[in-house]
Amino acid sequence: QNARQLLNAMARRADRHPPKPGTSPAESFHFHRQTQSRRARILGMLLVPLEEDYEIPLRRAPDLRLACTEAYGPGEGQALVSLRELLGLVGAHEWRKNGIVVPALGDRIHPHYGVFSPIRSEYVDLVADAPLPSNALAFDIGTGTGVLAAILARRGIARIVATDQDPRALTCARANLERLGLTDRVEVVQA
């Protein structure tokens, strides 16, 4: 809680200096991006120490060992991590644990750290409602969480090949499809 308050105070201080107006839209955009970059750089400088097992050796620090292990794998020594990174990691851990309701699926998807989360439903609804040319075979390229493959399987597609390049996404998609009971119709493949 204190760390988040410190980060918010730093953000408020960084936001005191708005970008200067440009003489053209392109220059205004450049100044805006420059200000955003400076803000991100400053906020990224607040570092938190981690022990080998991801314990935070600070008084009253929360236990983030499980969240860190899910995101980074086994610990490999002491490290310094940006507080913003740790806060994102905690959010990803909560999403993974609780899942995100996907109305078009009628179920929850549990995104893993580093895998795009289906929080905007427009593209999911499009796949859920679009007419399908065939029920025999579909491909989900860049499957991520596997949400689109799951929707296609629930719509009656006989065989779906879901691909991704990221090992985290492949692990995430497999876990979601297994939890949803759809592994008999969806094959998850490394691209």
Regions found by a protein language model. Name each.
Residues 2-100:
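N-terminal auxiliary segments of SAM/dcSAM-dependent transferases
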